[in-house]
Amino acid sequence: MTVTMQYEKDVTVAALDGKRIAVIGYGSQGHAHAQNLRDTGHDVIIGVRAGKSFDKAKEDGFETFEVAEAAKQADVIMILAPDEIQADLYNEEIAPNLEAGNALGFAHGFNVHFEFIKVPADVDVFMCAPKGPGHLVRRTFEEGFGVPALYAVYQDATGNAKHIAMDWAKGVGSARVGLLETTFKEETEEDLFGEQAVLCGGLTALMQAGFEVLTEAGYAPELAYFEVLHEMKLIVDLVYEGGFKKMRQSISNTAEFGDYVSGPRVITDQVKENMKAVLADIQSGKFANDFVNDYKAGRPRMEAYRKEAENLEIEKVGAELRKAMPFVGRNDDDAFKIYN
């Protein structure tokens, strides 16, 4: 199925005008959505539990309330808290304060699609999911453009849910550069698969395996780090800018020939079958239940995984090498660090 890119000209209804908007959470995405919407003239308040984020929201000039009070005051509520706490937050503080005709928004379909959150039939449920971290959503907005976004409607109680989703996307700047309509199911399952099989899980496992092959063969860990991890950004940037074609035009003929010859030897049909198994676990809800159950148990699996990852040789070698490269990491990520 193909989808058509939409832009500001396609947002024909100012569905958020006259609405009081509550952004729940003031982290990476929360601060960006709230500030961008305020800058486009909308009435935005923040709902967040007492702590650093509460103080930061007030410092940034927002009316800031506990979550329940913000939900009570709002017509449109966007939940931008971490996935694992959303269900409790919704059930305890938001659901009791919902009214018929309200709209409830998300930037990721996880809790709605897997039914950890169940919304009354008289409330709109929509999604606006910018395809970038919050600091980028904010920075690009300030520069006059934005980050592309997905939008979706799960429940249209008022007949206005799609207009709300699109106007939200316009308000955060995404309609300046492009919107794609999707569903909660599609966004959730594709997003999780991308993270697990390719972007995060697949990529880190590939780099770790390459590092181990080289060091186990007697090559210096420092050189192995450069070859399988440090240079990854250079290649990914080329692909990001112009696809596989630009990357292959930019590398040596030797590298390009090796790409064609050896890539399929590494990513075999069996690897593809393994990816299908990952997708099946996502589609069935197994991954979602494992993740939520681990959180409810105090995160024993997550903490064990983190501890194991911290002790990998590739991490230790990389930490030492980066000390000699002050230019690495010297960028505009301050906002990301502040809000997380």
From Swiss-Prot:
<comment type="pathway">
    <text>Amino-acid biosynthesis; L-isoleucine biosynthesis; L-isoleucine from 2-oxobutanoate: step 2/4.</text>
</comment>
<protein>
    <recommendedName>
        <fullName>Ketol-acid reductoisomerase (NADP(+))</fullName>
        <ecNumber>1.1.1.86</ecNumber>
    </recommendedName>
</protein>
<dbReference type="InterPro" id="IPR013116">
    <property type="entry name" value="KARI_N"/>
</dbReference>
<feature type="binding site">
    <location>
        <position position="252"/>
    </location>
    <ligand>
        <name>substrate</name>
    </ligand>
</feature>
<feature type="binding site">
    <location>
        <position position="231"/>
    </location>
    <ligand>
        <name>Mg(2+) 2</name>
    </ligand>
</feature>
<feature type="domain" description="KARI C-terminal knotted">
    <location>
        <begin position="183"/>
        <end position="328"/>
    </location>
</feature>
<feature type="binding site">
    <location>
        <position position="134"/>
    </location>
    <ligand>
        <name>NADP(+)</name>
    </ligand>
</feature>
<dbReference type="InterPro" id="IPR013023">
    <property type="entry name" value="KARI"/>
</dbReference>
<keyword id="KW-0479">Metal-binding</keyword>
<feature type="domain" description="KARI N-terminal Rossmann">
    <location>
        <begin position="1"/>
        <end position="182"/>
    </location>
</feature>
<feature type="active site">
    <location>
        <position position="108"/>
    </location>
</feature>
<dbReference type="Pfam" id="PF01450">
    <property type="entry name" value="KARI_C"/>
</dbReference>
<dbReference type="InterPro" id="IPR008927">
    <property type="entry name" value="6-PGluconate_DH-like_C_sf"/>
</dbReference>
<dbReference type="GO" id="GO:0004455">
    <property type="term" value="F:ketol-acid reductoisomerase activity"/>
</dbReference>
<keyword id="KW-0560">Oxidoreductase</keyword>
<dbReference type="Pfam" id="PF07991">
    <property type="entry name" value="KARI_N"/>
</dbReference>
<feature type="binding site">
    <location>
        <position position="191"/>
    </location>
    <ligand>
        <name>Mg(2+) 2</name>
    </ligand>
</feature>
<dbReference type="InterPro" id="IPR036291">
    <property type="entry name" value="NAD(P)-bd_dom_sf"/>
</dbReference>
<dbReference type="GO" id="GO:0000287">
    <property type="term" value="F:magnesium ion binding"/>
</dbReference>
<dbReference type="GO" id="GO:0050661">
    <property type="term" value="F:NADP binding"/>
</dbReference>
<feature type="binding site">
    <location>
        <position position="195"/>
    </location>
    <ligand>
        <name>Mg(2+) 1</name>
    </ligand>
</feature>
<dbReference type="InterPro" id="IPR000506">
    <property type="entry name" value="KARI_C"/>
</dbReference>
<feature type="binding site">
    <location>
        <position position="227"/>
    </location>
    <ligand>
        <name>Mg(2+) 2</name>
    </ligand>
</feature>
<dbReference type="GO" id="GO:0009099">
    <property type="term" value="P:L-valine biosynthetic process"/>
</dbReference>
<comment type="function">
    <text>Involved in the biosynthesis of branched-chain amino acids (BCAA). Catalyzes an alkyl-migration followed by a ketol-acid reduction of (S)-2-acetolactate (S2AL) to yield (R)-2,3-dihydroxy-isovalerate. In the isomerase reaction, S2AL is rearranged via a Mg-dependent methyl migration to produce 3-hydroxy-3-methyl-2-ketobutyrate (HMKB). In the reductase reaction, this 2-ketoacid undergoes a metal-dependent reduction by NADPH to yield (R)-2,3-dihydroxy-isovalerate.</text>
</comment>
<dbReference type="GO" id="GO:0005829">
    <property type="term" value="C:cytosol"/>
</dbReference>
<feature type="binding site">
    <location>
        <begin position="83"/>
        <end position="86"/>
    </location>
    <ligand>
        <name>NADP(+)</name>
    </ligand>
</feature>
<feature type="binding site">
    <location>
        <begin position="26"/>
        <end position="29"/>
    </location>
    <ligand>
        <name>NADP(+)</name>
    </ligand>
</feature>
<keyword id="KW-0028">Amino-acid biosynthesis</keyword>
<comment type="similarity">
    <text>Belongs to the ketol-acid reductoisomerase family.</text>
</comment>
<keyword id="KW-0460">Magnesium</keyword>
<dbReference type="InterPro" id="IPR014359">
    <property type="entry name" value="KARI_prok"/>
</dbReference>
<keyword id="KW-0521">NADP</keyword>
<feature type="binding site">
    <location>
        <position position="53"/>
    </location>
    <ligand>
        <name>NADP(+)</name>
    </ligand>
</feature>
<dbReference type="GO" id="GO:0009097">
    <property type="term" value="P:isoleucine biosynthetic process"/>
</dbReference>
<feature type="binding site">
    <location>
        <position position="49"/>
    </location>
    <ligand>
        <name>NADP(+)</name>
    </ligand>
</feature>
<comment type="pathway">
    <text>Amino-acid biosynthesis; L-valine biosynthesis; L-valine from pyruvate: step 2/4.</text>
</comment>
<keyword id="KW-0100">Branched-chain amino acid biosynthesis</keyword>
<feature type="binding site">
    <location>
        <position position="191"/>
    </location>
    <ligand>
        <name>Mg(2+) 1</name>
    </ligand>
</feature>
